[in-house]
Amino acid sequence: TRTSSSAASDVYKRQLIGIGIFMNGAQEILKSRRTIYKFSDKRVDYSELELAFEAADNAPCHKKTYPWKYYVVGRKSREMLLPTVISLCRKKEESKGNVASKQSEARAISKIMDVPVIIAVTTKLTPGDDFREEEDYAATVCSLHNLVLSLWSRGIGSQWSTGGITRHQSTYKNLGISETKERIIGFVKVGYPESIPGEKKVDARKIVEYL
């Protein structure tokens, strides 16, 4: 009937409006995201992490390999990383012709111990198939970005770190990650922002060509 047809049309219009509102919100989340370097002491609830992991697991993935894995690094596990953190700090200072000070070592330790949440992110390795590994790495980065954006949508900041500690052999050993099966692509540091950088992005017109 005309009445039922009109009602169905109204429902469809409301759905379209809802989708439009959602997409506008998503656009703002994408555009407003910033890398956070200073976190507050506010605790990040694990329920927030679970929502982010759910978003991460819905990333696009060619061939359905789902190569990503996330390790939430607790305090005791972080403490196991500290000898390597200090060693890397000293080597970095030596490469500059300096001697590592107690202050520089303390800063390096703080970057590991004082962050509310640290997540080690890995991608699956496929020995003998470089192209598969390349595709899986790309998929894992998409997954990681889903995680970051999900957190940002709820006011939680993050920083993707690829420092030397993320690639060191001892990190694999201390975190129980197999070097032959997985590659650590970085640590994601997570927490509520103490401050948000006013970072200026490149003009989008400079990164696009229509052929």
Question: Which residues does each predicted region cover?
Answer:
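Single conserved hydrophobic/aromatic residue that forms the stacking wall/gate
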Residues: 1-15
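Short, conserved glycine- and acidic-residue-centered signature motifs
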Residues: 4, 45, 136-140
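N-terminal amphipathic, basic helical "cap/leader" segment at the start of enzyme domains
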Residues: 19-114, 211
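Small-aliphatic-rich amphipathic alpha-helix that forms the alpha element of a beta-alpha
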Residues: 56, 119, 125-173
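Short loop segments at secondary-structure junctions
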Residues: 75-77, 124-125, 191-195
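Short, electropositive alpha-helical surface patch
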Residues: 171-183
